[in-house]
Amino acid sequence: QLLSKEHLVEAVNKLGLNRRGVVTARRVARYADGLSESGGESKARALMIERGWQTLELQIELFDPVEPGRPYRVDYLWRVGDRLIIGEFDGFVKSEKAAEEGKLAKAQFDERQRESRLSLLDNCKIVRLCWDDLRDPTKLDRKLKVAGVPRAC
């Protein structure tokens, strides 16, 4: 880790109020988190924050209900009462790499099995996000609303 969140917030706060962009920098620093695994995940999270969706947990391990010792890490997780809403961002990097290695069909099969297992968790819903949703944030809003993600208070 190059810089802790606390040090980033401290550095931005030292800039003073009269510097151009300091308000935006403070907001960004407040939400900084190194857990996102791709630019798409980070951009989606930024849009969710900007558009007023409830904050979420990043890169959370959930366990396979069929094989309880088997963990699956999810991109986003919202806990809403006794329900879990899992968010997954689908970029192209993993698919492209699998295709280059001649393993695309296996990767797609494994992903379907993973999603099938996660969907068996009690009171669980899965929402898949993609670059299209980021280019048209109203699509992102509709998906999150239908999935049951609450707005921030």
Show which residues each predicted segment covers.
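Surface segments flanking catalytic/ligand-binding clefts of nucleic-acid enzymes
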Residues: 1-153
